[in-house]
Curated annotation (Swiss-Prot):
Signal peptide start-end: none
Keyword Cell membrane recorded: no
Annotated cofactor note: Binds 1 FMN per subunit.
Residues the record lists as binding FMN: R55, M56, V57, L58, L59, K60, Y70, T71, K77, Q99, Q134, S135, W180, R190
Underlying gene: pdxH
Entry-linked PROSITE patterns: PYRIDOX_OXIDASE (PS01064)
Name listed for the protein in its UniProt record: Pyridoxine/pyridoxamine 5'-phosphate oxidase
Taxonomic lineage of the native organism: Bacteria, Pseudomonadati, Pseudomonadota, Alphaproteobacteria, Candidatus Pelagibacterales
Record-listed E.C. numbers: 1.4.3.5
Keywords, in A-Z order: Flavoprotein, FMN, Oxidoreductase, Pyridoxine biosynthesis
Source organism: Pelagibacter ubique (strain HTCC1062)
Cofactor: FMN
NCBIfam families per the UniProt record, alphabetical: pdxH, PRK05679.1
Catalytically driven reaction(s): pyridoxamine 5'-phosphate + O2 + H2O = pyridoxal 5'-phosphate + H2O2 + NH4(+); pyridoxine 5'-phosphate + O2 = pyridoxal 5'-phosphate + H2O2
One Pfam family here: PNPOx_N
Subunit architecture: Homodimer.
Length: 208
């Protein structure tokens, strides 16, 4: 690969492009090529003993202020984020041979934002937020299914299912964003944006 003639991240390094703008371009392209869930990401958190855990979640919104996902606040990831608000995200779009890694600090979204997103979910999903005590042990599958039916009876009006207090969103405020582009003979392209002490993005090309 001739890095000087690259039309990928080398060009982005030379141009004055904001990492959020670049992410939006890549996400929009992934929506056209990925068969399933282009907004899927691996979310890494860690417990009080610094032992990491990782799982797939879905990105539901992003802008200059951060990257938003929703979850049960009492789940493993919810509890870990309460105790240690540092987290990492990794997007991998196999169809485009691209990857994005994002590190940062999380904070809960406002009740207004959480309410608006929750109300946009389907009835079954809203009921599930009540019925599932995420990450806790259950005796069998029927226990969960019975809980779902109980909440369906309680909230039979599909237009009136309130958001549980234990269900909300987290906004990851990025401190660094790295873009990775596959290259021939494993000579990949890596472009990293890091926020300086004044909140400005500083770009660096990394060796593959």
């Amino acid at each position: 690969m001739n890095q000087k003639n690259s039309l990928g991240l080398n060009k982005c390094f030379l141009d004055k492009i904001d990492p959020i703008d670049l992410f939006e371009v890549w996400m929009n392209e992934a929506k056209k090529t990925e068969l399933n869930d282009p907004n899927a990401l691996a979310l890494a958190t860690s417990d009080q003993n610094n032992f990491p855990s990782i799982r797939m979640v879905l990105l539901k919104d992003f802008n200059k202020d951060g990257f938003v996902f929703y979850t049960n606040l009492n789940s493993q990831k919810g509890n870990e984020l309460k105790n240690n608000p540092k987290a990492s995200m990794c997007f991998h779009w196999k169809s485009l041979l691209r990857q994005v890694r994002i590190n940062g600090m999380v904070q809960k979204v406002s009740n207004k934002v959480a309410d608006e997103y929750y109300s946009s979910r389907g009835y079954e999903s809203r009921i599930g937020a009540w019925a599932s005590k995420q990450s806790t042990v259950i005796n069998n599958r029927d226990e969960l299914l019975n809980s779902i039916e109980e909440y369906k009876k309680k909230y039979s009006n599909k237009n009136d299912v309130p958001r549980p207090e234990h269900w909300s969103g987290w906004n990851l405020i990025p401190t660094s964003i790295e873009f990775w582009l596959d290259g021939e003979s494993r000579i990949h392209e890596r472009l990293k944006y890091t926020k300086d002490t004044e909140g400005n993005w500083v770009k660096s090309l990394l060796s593959p």
